[in-house]
Design a protein with these regions (language model features):
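A short mixed-secondary-structure module that forms the rim of ligand-binding clefts
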Residues: 62-118
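Short acidic, glycine-rich loop/turn motifs
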Residues: 38-45, 112-116, 200, 217, ...
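Short, contiguous, well-structured surface segments enriched in hydrophobic/aromatic residues
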Residues: 39, 59-60
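C-terminal edge-of-domain segments
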Residues: 2-12, 135-245
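Hydrophobic, proline/glycine-rich low-complexity stretches
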Residues: 1-53
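Short, conserved beta-turn/loop elements at beta-strand boundaries and strand-helix junctions
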Residues: 130-134
Length: 245
């Protein structure tokens, strides 16, 4: 599915940054890959580093794609949601559902690295499942038949023994009747970043030089990565950014 890449005027700085990074790395097939982490956190996150946390257990991680970027309603385009597709049968989603039984939303940490522009985003997110049927149908219809089949399986008890060799054909035939309706296993997880650490790494310090002999190189002056912290202020409904180094 093609990302919504048009950025309206005066949008939030996080959305501007992440869309710019996605566009500049879109030639890479894995440019939309996102790592999401969930764990039981004992202490609140440190103000200047997303890594100084104490976990009560090993964090549960999942790698997925950013399928779309949307504006959160009633925030005047200042708060952004990252849409991800998941299968409800995965351990990751089952764990989140257990967590949400007595909570309104789940805190997740997401990270993405862009090799071409040498950038890294680490995001503290509020996360929730989208339950609006119209929205679910919209994204479900964006999938092709093969992608839809990944969210559906046929109970072996419902397949006759003499048809076992054609199980794949039976699956396609079975699912073709239901493919217009979203699978019960299809879920939309929306990540809403509220605190973002953006690191821009310098290009390699040693580069080839046309005036040097083979295997010789020119050493460039050492440069440090630039680190920025972006925070969403709910009361003011605006983002602010500070450079950390």
């Amino acid at each position: 599915m093609k990302l919504s890449i048009e950025t309206p005027p005066n949008t939030n700085i996080f959305k501007q940054g992440i869309i710019k990074s996605l566009n500049e790395n879109k030639q890479l097939i894995f440019s939309k890959k996102l790592t999401i982490c969930h764990s039981s956190i004992k202490n609140s996150i440190n103000n200047n580093s997303p890594l100084k946390e104490e976990y009560s257990e090993f964090p549960l991680m999942e790698i997925t794609d950013i399928k779309d970027i949307i504006d959160i309603p009633n925030t005047e385009g200042k708060l952004t949601g990252l849409i991800c597709f998941f299968d409800k049968r995965t351990l990751f989603i089952e764990t989140i559902n257990d967590y949400l039984k007595d909570k309104e939303y789940i805190p997740l940490t997401a990270s993405i690295y862009f090799p071409l522009t040498r950038e890294k985003y680490i995001m503290n997110c509020k996360s929730e499942f989208i339950k609006d049927e119209k929205i679910i149908n919209k994204y479900w219809s964006s999938l092709n038949e093969e992608e839809k089949l990944q969210y559906e399986t046929v109970d072996k008890d419902s397949i006759k023994p003499d048809n076992d060799k054609n199980e794949k054909d039976d699956l396609v035939k079975y699912f073709a009747q239901e493919q217009k309706l979203p699978s019960k296993n299809f879920s939309l997880l929306m990540l809403i970043p509220i605190k973002v650490w953006h690191t821009i790494f310098p290009m390699p310090q040693v580069i080839a030089h046309i005036n040097k002999k083979k295997f010789e190189s020119l050493l460039k002056p050492h440069k440090m990565p630039k680190k920025f912290l972006m925070n969403y202020d709910k009361e003011k409904n605006e983002w602010n950014s500070v450079q950390l180094n």
